[in-house]
Amino acid sequence: KQGYFTVQDESSMCAVAAAGIRPEDFVMDICAAPGGKTTAAAEFAQQGHVLSMDIAEEKLELIEENVEWLKLANVDIRCQDATEYMQEQEKKADVVIADLPCSGLGIMGRKNDIKYRVTEEQIESLVELQHTILQNACRYVKAGGTLLYSTCTITKEENTLQVERFLKEHPEYTLKEQRQFLQGINACDGFYYAVLHKLGD
């Protein structure tokens, strides 16, 4: 209640930790609501800065609540559509967190209705949305920086195949680490992350 700590799924915390955020880093979280990764990043970048964004204004309130509750002074929150490129942020970020819209099949244990609602057509549409957002996200990363891609799903199309496609299109990036968590095998949500390193100029 006093904001000394917060509870977060292990998989999400592992993803943010794997990004290697340093105390002085500038971090962009481009699909941030409800703000768990934003606040975790802000804890790592205590002398740095986190720009936290989401397209849904009503969800920004959740981020604000979490930031205020944890008494974090290094976070700015903005309403922003991640499919729209922000020229002013080009090559500015040390780390970009791209936890993107997905089919959510990794959290069926908490939301059982997902398995009845998700269709192949929806997954195909989400894959293209993810691809579009990644094209913007990768341009915000400065040389030597990191792009963290993550989803709370388990499909190869949204995870490993998405990253393979990205790397073919962007030779300036290399895969540093990737990990797939599975419910029933790991003691956490189904979740995927890939840490992508941008080569120096």
Specify the residue positions occupied by each region the protein language model found.
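S-adenosylmethionine
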Residues: 1-201
